[in-house]
């Protein structure tokens, strides 16, 4: 029982960034892009992008901004999710790898996420279907048109953000000095991964209370099933066994986790977010990436299982690419290892050093 409550308290603090900080005060802002055109040709009269920044931009003698770091969140997440003791507390503080007194840190809420424009704002299923390319293009506009950032020292991201890091690399190959994708693969979403994402959507749509997206209350049965599917995608068998070593504790932990996610998730937003990966496929474009790149996965990541051998094949296409597979330890946490700099900080230090 005590283990479960401690697990949930830590998870709550981690998600909400409520642990004391050792880095500069984050500043929040919004940028509205007029008549944004999506990859499918549909347009949104006003696309709002929410963002958080820490620090101040600096320029070199060549006029390029030389200290901007873009960090991208995962599916159903937001930029604020990085502002916790485990991530920001180990990266953004004085003397740390991404010291916010030295770097200009940019945390954005992607299309469909956080405080940026999303289906639940009112359009529901009339909201344009978006892709990772749309997210990257919108963020590029935010950086160049609003924040006046003409160059990035580093692009890094976790999960969906890691996948977007690859897209950034080949879409704007001269825009960054370094790239670090965490918990991702640079290939089409297929096999078990695609089946899991498709199942999330199907479970929601199968609930009669979904009502083709026109629900007044969340379709609890379908959304609960989708949340359960997501939990098993990103969890660690080792860590969950440690947190819930008995049947009673496991069932209690499951109920509490599902209930917590039910309180913050919207069904339409969730479906759109997982469907945004449907056209993702960097593999044919990897040779276009110019910046030094270190990709990091963990051996207990069930979203990107190492036995597929996909990264080892694809990383060869990246001229300055390197792949690190973290072994399973008591500190790794499955897919979520991407948010623990203590596990991969040494490789970030290496990347920053070789890309000066």
List each language-model region with its residue ranges.
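Conserved acidic catalytic loop of the alpha/beta-hydrolase fold
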Residues: 133-154
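N-terminal cap/lid subdomain of alpha/beta-hydrolase-fold enzymes
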Residues: 52-121
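Conserved hydrolase catalytic core segment
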Residues: 150-193
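Conserved alpha/beta-hydrolase "acid-adjacent" motif
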Residues: 302-309
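Short beta-strand/loop motif that positions the catalytic acidic residue
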Residues: 289, 295-297
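Active-site nucleophile elbow and catalytic-triad environment of alpha/beta-hydrolase enzymes
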Residues: 269-285
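Catalytic active-site module of serine/aspartate enzymes centered on a nucleophile-bearing elbow/loop
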Residues: 318-356
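Alpha/beta-hydrolase-fold enzymes
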Residues: 175-260
């Amino acid at each position: 029982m005590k283990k479960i409550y401690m697990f949930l308290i830590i998870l709550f603090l981690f998600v909400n960034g409520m642990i004391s900080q050792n880095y500069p005060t984050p500043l929040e802002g919004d940028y509205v892009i007029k008549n944004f055109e999506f990859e499918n040709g549909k347009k949104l009269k006003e696309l709002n992008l929410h963002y958080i920044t820490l620090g101040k931009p600096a320029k070199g003698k060549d006029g390029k901004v030389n200290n901007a770091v873009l960090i991208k969140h995962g599916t159903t997440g937001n930029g604020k999710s990085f502002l916790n003791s485990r991530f920001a507390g180990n990266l953004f503080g004085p003397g740390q790898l991404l010291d916010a007194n030295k770097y200009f840190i940019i945390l954005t809420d992607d299309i469909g996420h956080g405080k940026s424009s999303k289906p639940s704002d009112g359009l529901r299923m009339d909201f344009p279907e978006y892709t990772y390319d749309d997210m990257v293009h919108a963020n590029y506009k935010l950086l160049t048109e609003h924040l006046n950032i003409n160059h990035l020292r580093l692009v890094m991201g976790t999960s969906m953000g890691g996948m977007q890091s690859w897209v950034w690399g080949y879409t704007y190959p001269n825009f960054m000095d370094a790239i670090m994708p965490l918990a991702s693969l640079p290939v089409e979403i297929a096999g078990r991964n695609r089946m899991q994402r498709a199942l999330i959507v199907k479970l929601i749509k199968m609930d009669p209370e979904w009502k083709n997206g026109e629900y007044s209350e969340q379709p609890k049965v379908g959304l609960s099933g989708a949340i359960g599917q997501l939990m098993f995608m990103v969890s660690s068998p080792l860590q969950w066994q440690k947190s819930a070593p008995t049947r009673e504790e496991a069932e209690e932990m499951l109920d509490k986790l599902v209930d917590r996610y039910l309180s913050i998730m919207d069904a339409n937003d969730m479906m759109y977010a997982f469907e945004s990966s449907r056209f993702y496929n960097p593999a044919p474009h990897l040779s276009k990436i110019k910046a030094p790149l270190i990709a990091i996965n963990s051996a207990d990541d069930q979203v990107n299982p190492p036995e597929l051998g996909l990264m080892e094949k694809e990383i060869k296409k990246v001229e300055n690419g390197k792949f690190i597979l973290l072994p399973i330890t008591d500190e790794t946490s499955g897919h979520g290892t991407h948010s623990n700099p203590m596990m991969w900080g040494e490789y970030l230090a290496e990347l920053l050093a070789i890309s000066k």
